[in-house]
Amino acid sequence: MMHKLLCSGLGTIALLAAAPLPAVPRGDEPVPVPRTIRQGIDFVYVDPQMSSVARRRQRPQNWLQRMFDPGAARRGRNAPNPMFVELARGLQQYQARWGQLPEVRIPAGPVLKRGARGKRVDLLRRRLGLSPGGGYDEQLFQIVTSYQGVHGLGPVDGIAGKATIASLNRGSDHYARRIAINVERAFRLPPTRTFDRYVVVDSGAAEARLFVRDRAVDEMRVIVGSAKTKTPMMAVLMRNAKANPYWNVPPELVKSLTAKKVKEQGLSYFRDFHYEVLADWGANAPVIDPKTVNWKAIASSKQLPTIRVRQEPGPWNSMGEMKFEMPNDYGIYLHDTPLKEKFAGDRWISNGCVRLEDYRRFAGWVFGRMPLETSQPEQIIPLPRPVPIYMTYLTVAPGAYGVVFRPDPYGLDAQAMPQMFGGQDRLASAA
């Protein structure tokens, strides 16, 4: 039954090899992915070389056989990515451990913990596969603790509070579907032996993992887009880095923010925050005096300004010391940041670009060694060879006992449900 359901759900999902949009001056900030491209499962394949990989994978052979035979998935060239294999195995383990339990609804009520007795405790015991009548004993405590750990319910304290009861009432099929969605996302990652080296940026976990011959050799925290300015799911080739980059302020911000700051702080704003003004967006545009610009007119105009405002390289620069460029028309790239303290808090706060926790370590990996430092601005440093960057979104991770669920900061799991399962209410057992 599960094979049939997954075939009907997944067979309708096609990979997207999207042609780039016409380039327009946008500054160093992302632009929205077109609404015609459905995010949640599919990548946008920006680079022609990546698109050719996509075409080879649009009709995978024996998808379900590989999924339910992880040994087969490891054999041969172009076998699915190891992340796919781990999540597929995790789905099996989840179904075996949690998918076979009785679907019993537990009514709302007080928190349940060790020593409690009553009808709701009996229902909780039955829901988790135990016989009624034993009360909230040590065995039930251990199972609730395990359930909380797998399903990302904090704190993991063995107490059946409101969140735990709500999760149990949601049913195992909801979570099995979430795993299946993540399995499908992982299938979009490169097959084994496709690339010697590549990077997976997971905006679901706000982490970047560096792969050599399909083995993760390093990982680091990253800051990614917020729920309003999501980092898109896409595959691109990183071709060069730029040392000591300028930050080009988007025309929208020049109109809405820069002009406002000039009104509030005067022309000293440019000196204090290391900005300069250029006549236009041309490659050889001259630097002009800010006092020659009618900032009041820019603020009130319905048109975007044609001048360019950019922040000079230095420790104050929003791009940090290095920017890793990946040609795409969505304005997405990886870069350093001067605000290292931000990595200790909420990491879903950027406008869509990816800020690296340790750009020096990252640069040392992509170049083979850290490039020689230079004081010259905008120094382009070609990579020895292009490095594929896969920007995905995973809300389930492999765990010691199958999988561990993580938050869904972009809400893409709910968005992907109808794409994959339509009106289906349940995901049948893999058994």
What does each model-found stretch correspond to?
Residues 16-23:
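C-terminal segment of classical bacterial N-terminal signal peptides
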Residues 1-10:
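Bacterial N-terminal signal peptides that target proteins for export
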Residues 24-26, 30-131, 138, 145-150, ...:
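Well-ordered beta-sheet/strand-loop patches within structured domains
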